[in-house]
A protein has these predicted regions:
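Substrate-binding pocket helix/loop in short-chain dehydrogenase/reductase
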Residues: 64-65, 72-74
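Conserved glycine-rich Rossmann-like NAD(P)H-binding loop of the short-chain dehydrogenase/reductase
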Residues: 1-12
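C-terminal beta-strand-loop-alpha-helix "lid" module of Rossmann-like NAD(P)-dependent dehydrogenases
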Residues: 140-195
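A short, exposed helix-loop element centered on a Lys and neighboring polar residues
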Residues: 88-89, 132
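The beta1-alpha1 cofactor-binding region of Rossmann-like NAD(H)/NADP(H)-dependent oxidoreductases
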Residues: 28-41, 70
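Residue(s) in the substrate-gating loop at a strand-loop-helix junction
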Residues: 107
Length: 264
């Protein structure tokens, strides 16, 4: 098993915390084609082949779309979508040889676009479409493609998300930031509370990914967490007008003074 990490220290920490004797790591920047090609060459030459590729790298940039500039939006797509496609393209020759699996990790937000997570939702929708197209294109070659969509899981990402949301407001014109500040603060606090209350653990997520890699007949989609499954079902069944009403509580305090209770 080869884990891709951004930094050497991340890889060493992973090895120290893992009890898997066969776990190794490689430093990979999925937004750099040279780094991605080096990863594929390492797998081919050192390990001789590849049975499965799990694309789990991602960033989440929260905030009103009015506060997210083009460079930030492109970064969201570059990491969460383009980088995943680069990894797939580089490793496909190995996967075709083994009739292997590709597992793309998306999110419950690949089913419905939530206010203040528009950039992230756009990336997840794109990754869902990417996965659907790949699944159909690669089926004749024996390479199977699945999506795993986790819901809220208590991990350090939520602290990073809150900090990124605060930076998005800090970088926006003051009048624009003031318009959204109260609503966004309430939204970020609600997200953190939802993650703390979630019963889905990282181990639950890992088991779901393992199923996608090993099921005799892998499904197109797997969900890790009741909230992710509920989001997908709600988005599929409700008309847009009712979905808009469902999310109205999030934006109810847009325009309210900072510190106002964000509940409607």
């Amino acid at each position: 098993m080869l884990a891709g990490v951004r930094r050497e220290e991340d890889g060493e920490k992973l090895l120290a915390e893992s009890h898997h004797e066969r776990l190794r790591y490689a430093v990979i920047d999925i937004t750099d084609d040279t780094s991605v090609r080096a990863s594929a060459e390492l797998v081919a030459h050192r390990y001789g082949g590849l049975r499965g590729l799990v694309n789990n790298a991602g960033i989440c940039l929260p905030g009103p779309l009015e506060c997210i500039d083009g460079e930030q939006f492109r970064r969201q797509l570059d990491v969460n979508v383009v980088g995943h496609l680069s990894m797939i393209r580089a490793h496909l020759p190995l996967l075709r040889r083994s009739h292997g699996r590709i597992v793309n990790v998306t999110s419950g937000l690949g089913s419905a676009a939530v206010p203040f997570l528009g950039a992230y939702s756009a990336a997840q929708f794109a990754k869902e479409a990417l996965s659907d197209a790949l699944r159909r294109e690669l089926a004749p070659t024996g390479v199977r493609v699945s999506v795993v969509a986790p819901g809220a899981i208590l991990t350090p990402i939520w602290t990073k998300v809150s900090q990124a949301g605060e930076r998005a407001l800090a970088d926006a014109p003051p009048a624009v930031a003031d318009l959204y500040r109260s609503a966004l603060q309430g939204f970020l606090e609600g997200n953190a509370q939802q993650a703390m209350a979630s019963r889905t653990t990282p181990e639950d997520f890992a088991r779901t990914v393992l199923r996608a890699l090993t099921d005799a007949r892998p499904r197109a989609r797997y969900w890790a967490g009741a909230d992710a499954r509920r989001m997908a079902r709600t988005a599929r069944l409700l008309p847009d007008s009712l979905l808009d009403r469902t999310f109205r509580a999030i934006t109810a305090q847009v325009g309210a003074p900072a510190g106002t209770d964000a509940r409607p």
